[in-house]
């Protein structure tokens, strides 16, 4: 029993908080992204497209993202 108490005391003294805070870090980092970035990343995952279709969709997605960015700038 003494070994367990010593290990516990060492852990508490180390200041390490354990795995429970890692989830918070993941949620904070994912919340900082925006939905346009997510759409682009998901579009890149589609493996059923040919090269021509992929380029066409990428161009249309980039254009719509730029239009949304310009609209946001004009609103502020």
From Swiss-Prot:
Keyword annotations from UniProtKB, A to Z: Acetylation, Protein kinase inhibitor
Source taxon at top rank: Eukaryota
Site (Important for inhibition): residue numbering on this chain: 16, 19-20
Residues with the N-acetylthreonine modification: 2
GO MF annotations in UniProt: cAMP-dependent protein kinase inhibitor activity
Family: Belongs to the PKI family.
Protein's job: Extremely potent competitive inhibitor of cAMP-dependent protein kinase activity, this protein interacts with the catalytic subunit of the enzyme after the cAMP-induced dissociation of its regulatory chains.
Other notes: The inhibitory site contains regions very similar to the hinge regions (sites that directly interact with the enzyme active site) and 'pseudosubstrate site' of the regulatory chains; but, unlike these chains, PKI does not contain cAMP-binding sites. The arginine residues within the inhibitory site are essential for inhibition and recognition of the enzyme active site.
Protein's UniProt name: cAMP-dependent protein kinase inhibitor alpha
UniProt source species: Bos taurus (Bovine)
Lineage: Eukaryota, Metazoa, Chordata, Craniata, Vertebrata
Gene name for this UniProt entry: PKIA
